[in-house]
Amino acid sequence: MAEPIIMAFICYQCGYGAADLAGTSRMQYPASVRPIRVPCTGKFLYYLRIKGIPKGADAVFVAGCKPNECAFETGNFSVEERVKMTKQILDEMGIGGDRIEMFFMSGADAGKFTEAVNEMTDRAKKLGPNPLKK
């Protein structure tokens, strides 16, 4: 079985720093992750409409700033609610709400980024391929 495709919507301020540090530190994680840098995770719902699970990703995660550290003040809190809502919708559609998750991290949390990738890869393997995948 091929590695599942994981889309990671990562905040430019925090999540991207963690992903970059993981790469420069040569930390190991599956190469099937597709990082997508966004200005703020608060814009997540817009990006999910055009990418991610509707386009066939097996799992999606959002890597945003830690609570009270968002450069845009409330972006990470608003996306947390959107992720919860999206989980519920995916469950109702029979796709599986566990295909999406929110992780909070700082730019120095390279280990947390690799843990998020590994966790979502394991989840996607357990859930099987995205039923919307063409």
UniProtKB/Swiss-Prot annotation:
Gene source species: Methanococcus voltae
Cited NCBIfam families: F420_non_VhuD (NF045873)
Domain of life per record: Archaea
Oligomer status and interactors: The F420-non-reducing hydrogenase vhu is composed of four subunits; VhuA, VhuD, VhuG and VhuU.
Cofactor(s) annotated in UniProt: [2Fe-2S] cluster
Keyword line: 2Fe-2S, Electron transport, Iron, Iron-sulfur, Metal-binding, Oxidoreductase, Transport
Cofactor note as given: Binds 1 [2Fe-2S] cluster.
EC number in record: 1.12.99.-
Protein name (database record): F420-non-reducing hydrogenase vhu iron-sulfur subunit D
Keyword Methyltransferase included in the entry's annotation: no
Assigned protein family: Belongs to the MvhD/VhuD family.
Record's keyword annotation contains Transport: yes
EC supergroup of this enzyme: oxidoreductase
GO MF terms, alphabetically ordered: 2 iron, 2 sulfur cluster binding; metal ion binding; oxidoreductase activity
